[in-house]
């Protein structure tokens, strides 16, 4: 996965299921063994999501959203997990191996992305939207052609994360 998840490292970071550690966009090793992790301490390498109202992205995988670095302003318990969907009755992703949601993206238009998941009995859908306040403002992400096309690809073909046609990261987004 490639995303800006670390506010202390400029630009994108990347990691995978086969490499040791996390790297900066120019290949410099940032950490040798600390991966972004989620439920069961599994490595989070499914998709990145704008959720907490910060300028960096969080990771969406295995039925939860986690932040790489805990932000006490966002999560008072100072833990990385921001939400676990199964606590709200939703534990059905589209794939057992990747636990992709039915849909995720900025469909409410405030740049933070929403998540749609099914109920365990397949009779209901759950739409999750963040409750974290933000002072950041961006245009509706669906107005970006690359983002719009990545949304279409996510739901028609092989599930991959969304990508913008421009860079948004910790050092570029200012509070309004």
Where are these regions (language model features)?
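Beta-propeller-forming repeat regions
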Residues: 1-176
